[in-house]
Amino acid sequence: MALNNRERITRAFDLLQEGLHDLVDEVMTRYFHTSDWPERMSAQDAQRYGRERRRLEKTDPQVQLRAITEYGREFSRELSRGQQSLASELRDTRNEWAHGAAFNSDDTSRALDTIERLLRAVNSMDSANDVRKLREDLQRTVYEDRTRKRSKPTNTASISASKGLKP
């Protein structure tokens, strides 16, 4: 059964989470000097914004993308600024996805392409290849839909001049 755009993005974010986990965990553990860095990050948020601590998970792509964008200097050995900007774009995409936004084919294709690029940047080739397959499937579906719309038979009526009428 064909996937819809939301399902494609959901699968891609699952693959992104897997692909980013090791790098983000390593860098953030080094920065916070503890493997429980999400707790430290949450404590900083609570202090900075004057609110209750929130439970953050290492495996949440929102937390991983936020780590890359907000602690960019810590990732500078692993990711260039351009590659880090992919994470910034994906934060917006992830927020739209989390809030139930609809994704057209162009937006979906861009999101899948950006996820694939970020996965390649962190050398998560298997996940990147899986995302590429999702994008290729989307492209195939779009092409088939457009071809089907163009080739639908149209009803035409032939009109011929009646005898006896002058042109």
Regions found by a protein language model. Name each.
Residues 1-167:
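Amphipathic alpha-helical interface elements
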